[in-house]
């Protein structure tokens, strides 16, 4: 985690828990299927809370892929596929060594700053979806 560069950080009042709740609400609308949402929530949950709010740090998941796969009830290959899909969706960046190793001290692993950078977009989507649901309830009298 490089401490000399500025990175996107969560706005005041936001926590990684709030980000997880937001993602759960909008997941289908950003192409995030339930199994991949579970992987993303797992990854987020294993980062330091302070890394989400400091512009001098990046939230990085550097846990071993094999161990994470076991905890998620997946094979390592399935988890690699999920990680690649999360990267294609612009939610993470994989920064690993040539052999795929991840190291916390070196800031190598699954980087979550792209997710933070898109937070405003996701909040706007959530607000739009809530407004649409409210409008539909008004139309149906519910």
Residue ranges of model-derived segments:
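Winged helix-turn-helix DNA-binding recognition segment
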Residues: 48-105
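Short, low-complexity, polar/charged sequence segments that are solvent-exposed and flexible
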Residues: 59, 98, 113-114, 128-132
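Short, cationic-aromatic polyanion-contact patches
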Residues: 97-119
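Short recognition helix of helix-turn-helix/winged-helix DNA-binding domains
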Residues: 1-60
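Extended alpha-helical scaffolds
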Residues: 117-142
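Conserved aromatic-histidine-acidic binding/catalytic patches
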Residues: 27-31, 56, 70-74, 124, ...
């Amino acid at each position: 985690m490089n401490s000399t560069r500025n990175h996107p950080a969560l706005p005041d009042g936001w926590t990684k828990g709030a980000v997880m709740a937001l993602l759960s609400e909008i997941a289908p609308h950003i192409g995030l299927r339930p199994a991949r949402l579970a992987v993303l929530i797992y990854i987020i949950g294993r980062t330091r809370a302070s890394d989400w709010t400091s512009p001098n740090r990046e939230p990085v998941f550097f846990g071993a892929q094999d161990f994470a796969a076991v905890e998620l009830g997946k094979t390592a290959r399935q988890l690699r596929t999920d990680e690649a899909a999360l990267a294609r969706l612009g939610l993470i960046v994989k920064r690993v060594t040539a052999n795929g190793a991840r190291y916390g001290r070196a800031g190598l692993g699954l980087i979550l700053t792209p997710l933070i950078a898109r937070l405003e977009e996701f909040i706007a989507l959530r607000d739009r979806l809530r407004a649409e649901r409210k409008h539909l309830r008004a139309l149906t009298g519910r």
